[in-house]
C-alpha cells in the first residue's frame, strides 16, 4: 500500500492507523482519510525527523572529539535545568533549548506567547510620528529545497510566497526579505550533470528568476541575496527565503475558537497543483522524481498575494480575526484542520480553478495564495466586504464544533471523520541511535598562507554576485536602510540587511 499510493508514512504509522480504525472507529478508513493523515503527519508538516527520539549518543574519536563532547555536555546541562527528564532528547530540543533557557531566566520577556506559532513574534516599541506605539515584529524563514530541484522557477517563487504568508497569518505586513541558497558548481558542463538531476546552472538561474519575479511583483524589498557553492548541494539543493513583518499590536487579537465560529477561505482558487507537495518533500528522491513530481510544485500568483497583504493591513479586517492560518503544506486538511479541535468542513464550498476535482484533491491540494481565518459568524458579512474591496473571494468552508473531531463532507457524503486525539498523535514517533562522526576538512590548515589564499580566490564563493543580486528589487517600499552593495565602487556586499518598519 505504501508503494502503490506513494505514501510518506512509515509501516509503523500504517499499523497505528489500522489499530485506531479497527478498535475505535470499527470501520475501514476512506482513501481521503489515509491521504489526509499521510499529509498531516508528514515530515514537512510535523517535523518528524527533528522530533525523532535520540538515544545511545556516541562521539567518534578524532581531533574535534573533545570540542564536540563539551558542546554536547553543555546541551545536557541546559536540558536538565530547563525541563529535567520530562522530555525526550530530539534535534528539535537541541535547536530550541537556548531560547527556552533564556526565557526561563527572564531574558525573553518581549517574546509573544500564543497558540499561533506561524512566525517568531516579539513585542517592540515603535516611534510613529513622535508617538510611541506597541508593535509586533515577526520573523520567519522557509525552505523549498525539494520543489526547487524539481521545478526551479516555481519552487523558488512559492518559497518566498509561503514565507510571506506565515507572518501574514499573524496579521503582520511583510516588508523585508533575505534569500540564501546552496548549489553545486554552476560552471560545470551540462554533460557532467548527475543522472536524474537538472544541471546546477539551470537550477541556480531558474530559482533566482522565480524568487525575484514573485518578490518584485508583490512589492517586497529583498536586500540580502547570497548563493553558497559546495558539492554537497548537488545531492540536495538549499533554497531559503527569510522575511520580516510587523504590525501594530492593537490590530492583532488572539482568541480561542468557540463552537459556532466559522472558518473563512480567502484568496486564490484551488486546483491540482501542489497535490502531494508535503508528502513529496518528506520522501527521498529517486530516479523518477524529476519526471513524476513536477505537479507537486505549486503554481504561484503574486498579484493575488499582494491583495491578501493589503487586506491584512486593514485594521477593520484584522480585528475581526480570532485565529488565522495560511494554506501551505497540506492544504485544507492542515490550514483549516489546525484552527480548532472540532471542525465540520464543507469541501464543496472551496472555490476551484476548474471542474472535476475529487474530495481528496480538495482536501490536500496546496494551491497558493489562500488564507484561512477564524471569525465569529456574525462578523462574516463585514469581513467579506473588506475582502471584496481588495477584489478577493471570501467563503465559509468550515464551522467549529463542540466535539473534538475533524470531519469533512464532499457532495453530501462524509469522507473524513476522525478524533482530534488520534490526529494529534502525529503518527508513531521514530527512535534513532546516534553516532557523531568528524567531518572532512576542505583545506590543509598547514599549507602555506599564500597557497591557501590563492586557492580560496579560485573558488566561486568569493566571486562578486552583484549580477544575481540585481535581479531582486531592494528599494521598493522606501524603507531600506542598507542597500545590498556599497563602498567606493558600489561592489562591496553588505553583511547584514536593515530596514525601517512599515508605519503608515
Each language-model region and where it sits:
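Glycine/proline-enriched, intrinsically flexible loops and inter-domain linkers
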Residues: 1-504
Amino acid at each position: 500500500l505504501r508503494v502503490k499510493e506513494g505514501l510518506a508514512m512509515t509501516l509503523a504509522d500504517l499499523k497505528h492507523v489500522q489499530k485506531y480504525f479497527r478498535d475505535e472507529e470499527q470501520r475501514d478508513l476512506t482513501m481521503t482519510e489515509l491521504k489526509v493523515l499521510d499529509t498531516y503527519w508528514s515530515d514537512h508538516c510535523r517535523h518528524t525527523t527533528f522530533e525523532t527520539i535520540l538515544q545511545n549518543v556516541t562521539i567518534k574519536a578524532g581531533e574535534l572529539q573533545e570540542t564536540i563532547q563539551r558542546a554536547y555536555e553543555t546541551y545536557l546541562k541546559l536540558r536538565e535545568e530547563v525541563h529535567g527528564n520530562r522530555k525526550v532528547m530530539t534535534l528539535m530540543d537541541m535547536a530550541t533549548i537556548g531560547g527556552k533557557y533564556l526565557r526561563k531566566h527572564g531574558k525573553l520577556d518581549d517574546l509573544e506567547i500564543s497558540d499561533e506559532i506561524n512566525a517568531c513574534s516579539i513585542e517592540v516599541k515603535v516611534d510613529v510620528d513622535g508617538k510611541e506605539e506597541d508593535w509586533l515584529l515577526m520573523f520567519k524563514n522557509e525552505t523549498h529545497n525539494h520543489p526547487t530541484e524539481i521545478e526551479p522557477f516555481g519552487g523558488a517563487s512559492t518559497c518566498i510566497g509561503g514565507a510571506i504568508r506565515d507572518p501574514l497569518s499573524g496579521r503582520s505586513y511583510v516588508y523585508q526579505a533575505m534569500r540564501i541558497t546552496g548549489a553545486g558548481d554552476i560552471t560545470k558542463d551540462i554533460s557532467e550533470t548527475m543522472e536524474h538531476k537538472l544541471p546546477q546552472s539551470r537550477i541556480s538561474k531558474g530559482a533566482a528568476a522565480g524568487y525575484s519575479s514573485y518578490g518584485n511583483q508583490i512589492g517586497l524589498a529583498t536586500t540580502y541575496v547570497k548563493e553558497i557553492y559546495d558539492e554537497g548541494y548537488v545531492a540536495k539543493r538549499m533554497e531559503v527565503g527569510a522575511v520580516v513583518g510587523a504590525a501594530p499590536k492593537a490590530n492583532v487579537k488572539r482568541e480561542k475558537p468557540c463552537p459556532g465560529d466559522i472558518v473563512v477561505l480567502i484568496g486564490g482558487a484551488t486546483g491540482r497543483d501542489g497535490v502531494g507537495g508535503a508528502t513529496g518533500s518528506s520522501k527521498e528522491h529517486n530516479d523518477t522524481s524529476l519526471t513524476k513530481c513536477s505537479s507537486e510544485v505549486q503554481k504561484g500568483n503574486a498579484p493575488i498575494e499582494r491583495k491578501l497583504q493589503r487586506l491584512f493591513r486593514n485594521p477593520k479586517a484584522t480585528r475581526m480575526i480570532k485565529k488565522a492560518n495560511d494554506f501551505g503544506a497540506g492544504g485544507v486538511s492542515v490550514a483549516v484542520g489546525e484552527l480548532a479541535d472540532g471542525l465540520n468542513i464543507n469541501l464543496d464550498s472551496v472555490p476551484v480553478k476548474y471542474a472535476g476535482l475529487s474530495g481528496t484533491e480538495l482536501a490536500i491540494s496546496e494551491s497558493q495564495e489562500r488564507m484561512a481565518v477564524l471569525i465569529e459568524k456574525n462578523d462574516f458579512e463585514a469581513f467579506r466586504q473588506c475582502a471584496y474591496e481588495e477584489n478577493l473571494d471570501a467563503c465559509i468552508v468550515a464551522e467549529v464544533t463542540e466535539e473534538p473531531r475533524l470531519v469533512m463532507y464532499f457532495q453530501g457524503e462524509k469522507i473524513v471523520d476522525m478524533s482530534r486525539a488520534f490526529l494529534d498523535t502525529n503518527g508513531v514517533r521514530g527512535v534513532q541511535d546516534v553516532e557523531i562522526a568528524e567531518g572532512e576538512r576542505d583545506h590543509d590548515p598547514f599549507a602555506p598562507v599564500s597557497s591557501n589564499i590563492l586557492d580560496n580566490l579560485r573558488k566561486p564563493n568569493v566571486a562578486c554576485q552583484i549580477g544575481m543580486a540585481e535581479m531582486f528589487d531592494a528599494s521598493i517600499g522606501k524603507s531600506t536602510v542598507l542597500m545590498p552593495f556599497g563602498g567606493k565602487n558600489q561592489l562591496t556586499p553588505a553583511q547584514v540587511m536593515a530596514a525601517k518598519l512599515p508605519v503608515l
